[in-house]
């Protein structure tokens, strides 16, 4: 985390030529690339099952990258934006959760048009002690930080930032799993010393992104989820398993 994106490679496999699909894909790809100043420098095309492989490369000065192994005991845990919306939308599309259409319309954009927090990642250099994007689920991705940093965490469920429409479905177990372990949010989960809260808020404001403190790093290994009553909450699912899908 924290690098300035510079270049990308793109490899595509398609079962057959489809000019309309390629035109729409290219429009979206280059819109995002141009937004972040990324040059397409190579790749490949071939016939086969639909496959997209994109690699993005960037630059960051030595010692400034936001890694997973820098969290320290007492650090605050932060999350950018809101989480759970994309996973809730996917659960709706897959028929695992009934939603009113007006509610579904509020979360579907998070699934189809996620926003990478590039500017925030860059702004957090020198402030955050560790960072990761939430692609596999908050519990799983925070778990990667804890594993690499050899620390534990207390996470406050009531503090997790979600849209009001997501909150209205939290009585459903699948919705709670979406917030904790759904993934596809691409928000940032990061840690920072407890005395850098004002600095975190200032750079987030400059980047145009809301951030929320959701817990703290502990010396003891393990991740404890805390309920509104201050008592530990049980959880089973932690996130997407790449080799179980």
Protein language model annotation of sequence segments:
Residues 4, 84-88, 104-110, 164-166:
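Short acidic/polar alpha-helix capping motifs at helix-coil junctions
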Residues 16-39, 46-50, 57, 126, ...:
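Glycine-/charge-enriched secondary-structure boundary and capping motifs
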Residues 65, 120, 199-203:
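Hydrophobic side chains in well-ordered alpha-helices
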Residues 102-144:
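Polyanion-binding loop/helix "lid" in catalytic or ligand-binding cores
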Residues 4-94, 216:
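Glycine-rich anion-binding loops of enzyme active sites
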Residues 92-102:
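Acidic/polar short surface loop at catalytic or gating sites that assists cofactor/ion binding
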Residues 43, 69, 80-82, 109-113, ...:
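Glycine- and other small-residue-rich loops at beta-strand/loop junctions that grip anionic moieties
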């Amino acid at each position: 985390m924290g690098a300035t994106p510079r270049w990308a490679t793109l490899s595509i496999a398609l079962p057959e030529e489809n000019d309309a699909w390629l035109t729409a894909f290219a429009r979206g790809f280059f819109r995002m690339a141009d937004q972040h100043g990324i040059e397409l420098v190579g790749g490949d095309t071939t016939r086969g099952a639909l496959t997209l492989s994109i690699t993005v490369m960037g630059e960051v000065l030595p010692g400034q990258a936001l890694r997973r192994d820098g969290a320290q005991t007492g650090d605050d845990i932060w999350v950018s934006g809101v989480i759970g919306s994309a996973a809730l939308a996917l659960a709706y599309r897959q028929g695992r959760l009934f939603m009113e259409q007006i509610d579904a319309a509020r979360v579907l954009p998070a699934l189809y048009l996620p926003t990478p927090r590039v500017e925030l990642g860059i702004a957090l250099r020198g402030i955050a002690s560790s960072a990761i994007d939430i692609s596999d689920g908050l519990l799983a991705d925070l778990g990667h930080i804890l594993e690499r940093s050899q620390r534990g965490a207390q996470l406050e469920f009531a503090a997790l930032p979600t849209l009001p429409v997501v909150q209205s479905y939290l009585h459903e177990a699948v919705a709670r799993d979406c917030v904790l372990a759904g993934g596809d949010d691409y928000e940032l989960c990061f840690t920072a010393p407890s005395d850098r809260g004002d600095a975190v808020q200032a750079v987030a404001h400059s980047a145009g992104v809301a951030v929320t403190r959701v817990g703290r790093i502990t010396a003891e290994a393990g991740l404890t989820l805390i309920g509104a009553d201050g008592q530990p909450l049980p959880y089973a699912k932690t996130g997407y398993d790449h080799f179980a899908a």
